[in-house]
């Protein structure tokens, strides 16, 4: 099948007409599927718009062409839909999960997440997937009959299982959650609206998760080249990108550095999409699932890179870790960003009246217990954009890092 050609709807895809429903019953739309409604609600949410001013790697004022959480999410959605189309999956659900997967990220990317996690260590920590679930089910206030967006079970399942199952069938946390347990927000919500966190997610969710990896790898290379942290030929240290660079050099021997980088990113995306699609088709052929439930109850994920590509993808991540994420220029800014988030958290804890009126409890801050106050402050800070966090810090403190 040619890349971009749509396969017939597969029996193992999610069918919007057979959705497990929403938390709050709503009449169906006359002209949109249940999953298309989910996607539209995400796009029109306040949280989605805020992604425009949330950091991917570089802070918002460093350049107009660097990725933000918004541009990253759009790129993930494009890649995810391309894969879903070839596999015969529901593209609307796949797109929804791609667009929603980063809604819970705090300002300043992983620096903000580390800071909030440290501040909340005695109160369950901070997990951005759990925060995304809170945004989708509680923190958006747009509809008269419910808080949140009232999305389908399938969308919420995909958000929660972005990294796969969280527990085994007995409820014991899987290794990545063994030390601290399943994030409290996910565990508590799943008790009310069972998301079967012991099972795999749908293929649509698995595709969105792998598309996230592909987008990160390719587009962080693009941003790193643009920032001058490394050059195209430095990527010859990775066998996969070295092979792609050699091919580009043969076809376009006089190509300038900027266009070489753009061509490398384009070819890397195409290569990774082809690899994950082929491996997924192979696994589906072996497992022969006849329904989405067969996918959920499988012994392993169905959407994956082939083993040699998984090694290559890990090598790309290792290169980016050394040359970009751990570059002193980036690390210096992220250290200051962590300090800003930690300062704000402590300030609001000590002086809750500094919170905006809409974020104060109805009975006043004095009547609120510590755990509730911490949760309220967590939700407020996690929703901030980079620029709002800086503005708040400047309002509340005498000195604020300029993050340059």
Curated annotation (Swiss-Prot):
**What Pfam families does the annotation carry?**
HD (PF01966), HD_assoc (PF13286)
Domain HD intervals: 69-217
Its protein name is Deoxyguanosinetriphosphate triphosphohydrolase-like protein
Entry's PANTHER family?
A: DEOXYGUANOSINETRIPHOSPHATE TRIPHOSPHOHYDROLASE-LIKE PROTEIN, DEOXYNUCLEOSIDE TRIPHOSPHATE TRIPHOSPHOHYDROLASE
GO MF annotations, alphabetized:
dGTPase activity
SMART domains named among the record's database cross-references: HDc
State the Gene Ontology BP annotations.
Answer: dGTP catabolic process
* HAMAP family according to UniProt: dGTPase_type2 (MF_01212)
Question: Which InterPro entries does UniProt cross-reference here?
Answer: dGTPase, dGTPase-like, dNTPase_2, HD/PDEase_dom, HD_domain, PHydrolase_assoc_dom
Question: Sorted alphabetically, which keywords does the UniProt record give?
Answer: Hydrolase
Kindly indicate where the leader peptide sits in this chain.
none
The ranges of region (Disordered) come to 1-33
Q: Does the keyword Hydrolase apply?
A: yes
Task: Name its species.
Answer: Rhodopseudomonas palustris (strain HaA2)
